[in-house]
């Protein structure tokens, strides 16, 4: 049996509600509109710190009390935020030390958000105190279903507080200055430190010549880790504060998908449930959106997550803020549910009238009534989710194929001085995920600390950094019969970004049965080629020049001085096999490779669908039923063969094996069937 992640009897539907921005007459009309839209859950108090605490010693919850009672009276559940995402002006005025210093050394003044130094003792004290006051005040309010700590944690600070805290962090991690010198390789350029006070933080005033370009990768990598840990400590202080008074209410904070500055795999260990905000750009493909959902599900150990925010239609920060076409909001909401969401929440309930988010989408527009396209679409979706009830809550995905993703690896790759400015870790992950996605292969995104034994295939694109013990885990996985795939620029460094000497790919050399002698970085537009399985494919970005040490050649380069050298290899290892892909290639190659390795591993698509129809399978809480989500991302209707007797939970229609189910443009079906 699988458990629900929170105390809800349906997929929660609602989102960020900011009544403090409006008069109380508007509140009453909001309640009417919420009923029409089938809203059942609201996130309150996200940015109310200045209202709740007008000075150092005064806490005034009077208005929030009225709001909390109003939503309770109207049958709404509450996700209660702690309001610490933006500090009040009086605090910045009285304690300027709480203000962040930017990467270029510029000290901030009051304004914006993400504006507090995470290592300011004053900020930490006041934020934790507010969280505790809120929890103590509302501990007997029985309508809170979750705590929402701060909001979209992020950013970095480079102030004196942070520099001092960085030295403390280094002492705890490395113990001696000699070890710091070793792991940072400070003999290079005469950077040897003899005293902790000599260490300065890395920014544009010291080791960096651009935000992502550093002269000492080890220093910059550790500062990234330190910054993520520092902000995590702020979250944990508030987590502990609310748990002291409300131990049974789950606690989360809204993450942001592939957000580079924070190591969410580490953060998720301290979250009762993962939640995140999904704001794809106009150019993002369905596979890119799906990958972000998979990452968020993955960091939570495969449990369902909360979709805490999405826009009902437009965002406000893109160069061109296009409308979501009719049906797309519904489609993307169900896509989130298919990949593990147990909520469908929006920012925002009512569109604000001032500042930078006044043109961000909302359920209730500036016209202030229900007579808008967006409201009608939201209300229709709300009715469907109400009818769906608790059917899909707590459902899980089957474990078959996985892609390894690691934040430290991400940071290290893109801090690297070479081999190519075009090398982006997320792009390489996406290439392999898209090939799995297009073939409807069940895929998890896992970290290097996760259990590998449940999977048949593990793909680790650009596993540049091999942390201690990870090579042994991979070897054990393959030895036991697993199929492992990795690529160019893998196995080069340890967890300090120090090169593993003795030949690339370092500790993976024996497993892969190859030695990479050198690597050719191709400028944009320059292409080599190789032929595999009768099809000719591109070789771009990086071309590894490798020698065989027990592997077999599956394909070779066709051009340049390394024509005839291996580009794709395979080595049998124990009961399994390890593949090495020496280049970035084209979509058809990735699809062919995925098809071959999944066939060898006995992994089959969850459904056969035409192009543009996504199929996702989840197993119900009782493990006796499963749900096949069919999502048509195309502007035309498409038909899907029904492979097993099923009931469509969206329409209520019964479908027999062998029949054809027609999905309209942007249409959705959820086929419930026996396992």
Residue ranges and their predicted role:
Residues 1-43, 54, 69-73, 77, ...:
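N-terminal carbohydrate-binding accessory modules
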Residues 9-11, 38-40, 72-78, 140-145, ...:
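Short, well-ordered coil/turn segments that N-cap beta-strands
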Residues 12-22, 47-62, 109-128, 150-157, ...:
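The substrate-binding groove and active-site-proximal loops of carbohydrate-active enzymes
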Residues 15, 34, 42, 71, ...:
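Conserved, mostly hydrophobic/aromatic
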Residues 22-36, 127-133, 256-266, 325-333:
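Short, acidic/polar
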Residues 29-35, 43-106, 238-245:
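Aromatic-lined substrate-binding rim segments of carbohydrate-active enzymes
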Residues 105-273, 277-291:
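Polysaccharide-binding and catalytic clefts of secreted carbohydrate-active enzymes
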Residues 199-203, 248, 257, 268, ...:
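Carbohydrate-binding surfaces of carbohydrate-active enzymes
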